């Protein structure tokens, strides 16, 4: 695949063209994490599943926005076996988020967004 097709601008355009479509962006958007944060904040129909990248590598801006402006849009993802579950759970805990936010990230947001 061509990496430019993974740029958050493609998701932004899709979300603008189909405002009633619920879109779940997968992976953290690297190397365009800041742009993906902007798309998730700007588009009400875009949520974000954070698989394929260990939380210990999340940039500070993403860590901050997960507990603030993005708290209702972030979903846990593993991409197992590329990253072991033990490591993922440990690194998520090490971020120090409150239990209520962790419940949102690990299941609450997905249940709401996906209608489960």
Annotate each language-model stretch with its function.
Residues 27, 48, 79, 102, ...:
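Conserved, mostly hydrophobic/aromatic
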């Amino acid at each position: 695949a061509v990496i430019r097709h993974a740029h958050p601008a493609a998701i932004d355009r899709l979300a603008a063209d189909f405002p009633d479509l619920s879109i779940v962006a997968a992976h953290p958007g690297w190397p365009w994490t800041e742009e993906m944060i902007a798309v998730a904040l700007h588009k009400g129909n875009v949520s974000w599943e954070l698989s394929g990248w260990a939380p210990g590598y999340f940039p500070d801006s993403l860590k901050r926005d997960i507990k603030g402006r993005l708290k209702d849009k972030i979903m846990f993802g593993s991409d197992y076996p590329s990253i072991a579950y033990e490591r993922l759970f440990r690194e998520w805990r090490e971020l120090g988020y409150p239990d209520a936010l962790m419940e949102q990230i690990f299941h609450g947001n997905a249940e709401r967004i996906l209608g489960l």
